[in-house]
């Protein structure tokens, strides 16, 4: 399963970066979830 970080908020313009950082550089927002891609 994919690890999940904090929820992604569309009002936060830095959210994509926060999600990537939380996932160790490989993650993206999908809806309101931050999904980590295990690479």
UniProtKB/Swiss-Prot annotation:
GO cellular component terms given for this protein: extracellular region
List of residues that carry Arginine amide: 38
Entry superkingdom: Eukaryota
SUPFAM superfamilies assigned: Scorpion toxin-like
Signal peptide as annotated in the record: 1-3
GO molecular function: potassium channel regulator activity; toxin activity
Tissue-specific expression: Expressed by the venom gland.
Predominant cellular place of this UniProt entry's protein: secreted
Keywords annotated in UniProt: Amidation, Disulfide bond, Ion channel impairing toxin, Knottin, Potassium channel impairing toxin, Secreted, Signal, Toxin, Voltage-gated potassium channel impairing toxin
Disulphide bonds in the chain: 5-22, 8-29, 19-34, 23-36
Subcellular location: Secreted
Pfam families tied to this protein: Toxin_5
Annotated function: Inhibits Kv1.2/KCNA2 potassium channels. On glioma cells, may interact with chloride channels (probably Clc-3/CLCN3) and MMP2 at the surface of glioma cells. This complex may be then internalized via caveolae, thus inhibiting the chloride channels necessary for cell shrinkage and tumor propagation.
Domain notes: The presence of a 'disulfide through disulfide knot' structurally defines this protein as a knottin.
Record family assignment: Belongs to the short scorpion toxin superfamily. Chloride channel inhibitor family.
Name of this protein: Chlorotoxin-like peptide MeuClTx
Phylogenetic classification of the source organism: Eukaryota, Metazoa, Ecdysozoa, Arthropoda, Chelicerata
């Amino acid at each position: 399963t994919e690890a999940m970080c904090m929820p992604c908020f569309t009002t936060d313009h830095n959210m994509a970066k926060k999600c990537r950082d939380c996932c160790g550089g490989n993650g993206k927002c999908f809806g309101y979830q931050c999904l980590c891609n295990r690479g």
